């Protein structure tokens, strides 16, 4: 494919990437040996870029084959890490880049956020037994049931069945995942929907650098409600069209300080905006627009980033990563 004109090979190793039937995309469960073979197939082609998008459930194993590829190949590599010690990986990429390797960590211009809603593919009640009983119904029928105070109380008294759901999905897909891997994925799923300090009601226009006072945790304190009840009440507003913005990547002190830091790295490249792999949960195709509008023009939570640097990270840097503009600085 590369010899016929493909830019490279991209591999997905995150539980967020599934098809319309909920099945993991190819590569998600591949072994490190298989990944190494795929990576060096790019190398044997003599050109092209390898992209890795991974939850890094076992960081040492992922880093091991990636380091071997970097040491032996002159092809490009770009990494987007969604879990684990991403700083360690990014600093490794920066070190290798400064040594002359075309190794670039991707970073999004805003926190990767999951959109929880009654029409999304994930929200905090999707694993509750009572919600499962009505999940197949049209939105207006689900809303009618969810507005019933008795149903609301029933669902708030339940607990989601994360591990059981992941085990069932693995069995249906004839997955070779171990119990430990399924448990780890279930923990990620639980974390995704229960980190209320970094979940926010999505405003219009969206605010992608919200404060702690905007969080579900803070609203729960102010309303003297549980976080689950706050989310429940918000989800049934606006005829079920309202959305909760749940930060997936770290959002320390409710500021995007990490974006400022990564922009300054020589190796970094603007990314995380494919826009299609998880369109029922994440809407990231507007990331380039956020980079320009928020960071160069509108930001009030801290310092801005020069417009020309943002444009460079989104254009020339990307071209160099993909093997174009060879020799240019």
Language-model regions, residue ranges each:
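Substrate-recognition/cap regions that form aromatic- and gly/pro-loop-enriched pockets
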Residues: 256-264, 268, 273-305, 323
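Polyanionic/metal-chelating signatures
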Residues: 1-2, 24, 42-43, 58, ...
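Glycine-rich tight-turn/loop motif centered on a GG-T
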Residues: 20-31, 48-52, 77-79, 245-248, ...
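Short, well-structured alpha-helical segments that form the helix of a local strand-helix-strand
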Residues: 228-235, 306-316
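Acidic, glycine-enriched loop/beta-strand segments at the rims
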Residues: 243-259, 305-311, 319-329
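Flexible, glycine/charged-enriched surface loops at secondary-structure junctions
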Residues: 8-11, 49, 53, 100, ...
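Hydrophobic, well-ordered secondary-structure elements that form the walls
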Residues: 224, 274, 292, 310-311, ...
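Hydrophobic, small-residue-rich alpha-helical packing segments that form membrane-like cores
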Residues: 1-49, 53-72
């Amino acid at each position: 494919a590369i010899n016929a004109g493909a830019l490279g090979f991209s591999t997905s190793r995150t539980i967020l990437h599934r098809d319309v039937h909920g099945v993991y995309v190819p590569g998600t469960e591949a072994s490190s040996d298989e990944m190494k073979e795929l990576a060096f197939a790019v190398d044997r082609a003599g050109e092209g870029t390898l992209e890795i998008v991974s939850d890094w459930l076992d960081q040492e194993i992922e880093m091991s084959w990636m380091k071997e590829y970097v040491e032996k190949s002159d092809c490009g590599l770009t990494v987007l890490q969604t879990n684990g010690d991403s700083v360690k990986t990014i600093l490794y990429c920066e070190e290798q880049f400064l040594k002359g390797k075309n190794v670039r960590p991707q970073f999004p211009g805003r926190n990767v956020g999951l959109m929880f809603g009654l029409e999304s593919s994930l929200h905090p009640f999707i694993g509750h037994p009572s919600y499962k009983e009505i999940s197949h119904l049209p939105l207006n029928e689900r809303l009618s049931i969810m507005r019933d105070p008795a149903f609301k109380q029933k669902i708030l008294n339940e607990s989601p069945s994360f591990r059981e759901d992941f085990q069932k999905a693995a069995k249906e897909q004839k997955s070779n995942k171990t119990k430990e891997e399924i448990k780890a994925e279930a923990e990620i799923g639980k974390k995704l929907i229960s980190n209320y300090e970094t979940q926010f009601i999505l405003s219009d226009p969206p605010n992608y650098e919200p404060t702690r006072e905007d969080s579900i945790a803070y609203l729960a304190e102010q309303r003297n409600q549980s976080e689950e009840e706050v989310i429940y009440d918000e989800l049934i507003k606006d005829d079920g069209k309202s959305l909760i913005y749940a930060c997936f990547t770290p959002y320390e002190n409710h500021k995007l300080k990490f974006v400022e830091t990564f922009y300054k790295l020589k190796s970094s490249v603007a990314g995380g905006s494919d826009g299609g792999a998880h369109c029922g949960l994440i809407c990231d195709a507007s990331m380039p627009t956020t980079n320009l509008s928020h960071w160069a023009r509108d930001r009030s939570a801290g310092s801005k980033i020069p417009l020309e640097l943002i444009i460079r990270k989104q254009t020339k840097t990307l071209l160099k990563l993909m093997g174009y503009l060879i020799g240019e600085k």
